[in-house]
């Protein structure tokens, strides 16, 4: 049975670049991989065929020979493009995608890397501040429990005067490759657990861990205008890495205490202020607080009703990393008098008897509509 053309198998032209062939191969390999098609013999055959085609065409010399002589270039014991070690590096990337055992961010040594380099863990710190502190910004000193590199063994985990030996199982790579059928799977070394080294005489200060627990003091700059839930990242301030690996990051999550007077919406502030019935009816001025600690005057016009809102421009919160500032909104509510004296009651009753619909336009309009609805007299 004649073999199919390698270019046809990969779905590329004879002028395809190495990058185009690699993209085509990766797509086909993931489609027909046996793990995605368990028990499918056709997919298994197709997968082998794709591997064979790519190994030939990804090699410059083999591709030149194939372009000139076709499949005959590898016949007569020519050692055709099977599934050899020269193909293993690329397939290892494919297997990482399938089995989730990738090398990103540390762990075991990759090809040509450093044995056992492991990135330190990220840390989280919750910081609560006041609204005033969010307005001005602040420098905060915090203490965090964390792991740092052991100073006695310098992070090696070995007792001073000794040093780790190369793991004989993985030859220092931290990973071992096992054959399963016609392909290989790369796993973390079970002997050294990915370190690539064996510590025979552990450091007594860190018990061979390479790190010790300590409390660290850090200074954090909280900028003006921060909002509730904001996250501040401090690169490299997390746990120390292992065996020369990079440190993790520290994430500071901000929460803002509820304020006694102000509610916040973005850069704007809102404040509810009580006013007397007389001020609402006759007009007047009220003094209201501002977030910067000062006070300002607000003119209340005659006839002001509850829920009337007044805007004070530029008295809100600063916008983070900007020169813009929000506004302050004052919402008034008319306070009903309580604990009245006899004389006060008489005065209010006299006012009520002398009042006309023009004094209460909303009430008059409402009860007029109710009267029309029910078709009868309705007394306010």
From Swiss-Prot:
Pfam families: DnaJ, DnaJ_C, DnaJ_CXXCXGXG
Binding site for Zn(2+) 1: 150, 153, 203, 206
GO molecular function: ATP binding; heat shock protein binding; unfolded protein binding; zinc ion binding
UniProt KW Lipoprotein keyword: no
ZnF (CR-type) residues: 137-215
Alphabetic keyword roster: Chaperone, Cytoplasm, DNA replication, Metal-binding, Repeat, Stress response, Zinc, Zinc-finger
Cofactor note: Binds 2 Zn(2+) ions per monomer.
Leader sequence segment: none
CXXCXGXG motif repeat ranges per the UniProt record: 150-157, 167-174, 189-196, 203-210
SMART domains per record: DnaJ (SM00271)
Residues that coordinate or bind Zn(2+) 2: 167, 170, 189, 192
CC cofactor: Zn(2+)
Gene3D superfamilies listed in its UniProt record: DnaJ domain, Heat shock protein DnaJ, cysteine-rich domain, Urease metallochaperone UreE, N-terminal domain
Domain J as annotated: residue spans: 5-70
Biological process annotations from GO: chaperone cofactor-dependent protein refolding; DNA replication; protein refolding; response to heat
Entry note about domains: The J domain is necessary and sufficient to stimulate DnaK ATPase activity. Zinc center 1 plays an important role in the autonomous, DnaK-independent chaperone activity of DnaJ. Zinc center 2 is essential for interaction with DnaK and for DnaJ activity.
Record family assignment: Belongs to the DnaJ family.
Function: Participates actively in the response to hyperosmotic and heat shock by preventing the aggregation of stress-denatured proteins and by disaggregating proteins, also in an autonomous, DnaK-independent fashion. Unfolded proteins bind initially to DnaJ; upon interaction with the DnaJ-bound protein, DnaK hydrolyzes its bound ATP, resulting in the formation of a stable complex. GrpE releases ADP from DnaK; ATP binding to DnaK triggers the release of the substrate protein, thus completing the reaction cycle.
Classification via HAMAP family: DnaJ
Record note on quaternary structure: Homodimer.
Protein name in the entry: Chaperone protein DnaJ
């Amino acid at each position: 049975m004649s073999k199919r053309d390698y270019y046809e198998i990969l779905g590329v032209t004879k002028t395809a670049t190495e990058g185009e062939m690699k993209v085509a191969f990766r797509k086909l390999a993931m489609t027909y991989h046996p793990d995605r098609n368990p028990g499918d013999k056709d997919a298994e055959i197709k997968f082998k065929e794709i591997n064979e085609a790519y190994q030939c065409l990804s090699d410059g010399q083999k591709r030149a020979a194939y372009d000139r002589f076709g499949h005959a270039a590898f016949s007569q014991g020519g050692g055709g493009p099977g599934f050899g070690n020269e193909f293993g590096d690329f397939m290892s990337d494919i297997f990482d995608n399938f089995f989730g055992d990738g090398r990103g961010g540390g762990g075991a040594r990759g090809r040509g890397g450093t044995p056992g380099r492991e990135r330190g863990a990220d840390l989280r710190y919750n910081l609560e501040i006041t609204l005033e502190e969010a307005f001005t910004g602040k420098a905060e000193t915090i203490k965090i429990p964390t792991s740092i590199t052991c100073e006695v063994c310098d992070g090696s985990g070995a007792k001073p005067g000794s040093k780790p030996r190369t793991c004989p199982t993985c030859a220092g790579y931290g990973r071992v490759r096992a054959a399963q059928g016609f392909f290989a799977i790369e796993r973390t070394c079970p002997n050294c657990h990915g370190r690539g080294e064996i510590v025979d005489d552990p450091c007594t200060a860190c018990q061979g861990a390479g790190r010790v627990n300590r409390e660290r003091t850090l200074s954090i700059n909280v900028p003006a205008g921060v909002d509730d839930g904001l996250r501040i990242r401090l690169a490299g301030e997390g746990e120390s890495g292992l065996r020369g690996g990079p440190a993790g990051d520290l994430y500071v999550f901000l929460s803002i205490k509820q304020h006694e007077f102000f509610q916040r919406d973005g850069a704007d502030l809102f404040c509810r202020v009580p006013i007397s019935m007389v001020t609402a009816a006759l007009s007047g001025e009220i003094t209201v607080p501002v977030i910067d600690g000062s006070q300002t005057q607000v003119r209340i016009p005659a006839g002001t009703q509850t829920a009337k809102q007044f805007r004070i421009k530029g008295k809100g919160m600063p916008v983070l990393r900007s020169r813009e500032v929000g506004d302050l909104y004052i919402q008034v509510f008319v306070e009903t008098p309580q604990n009245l004296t006899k004389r006060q009651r008489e005065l209010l009753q006299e006012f009520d008897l002398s009042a006309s619909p023009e004094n209460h336009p909303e009430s008059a309009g409402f009860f007029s509509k109710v009267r029309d609805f029910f078709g009868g007299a309705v007394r306010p």
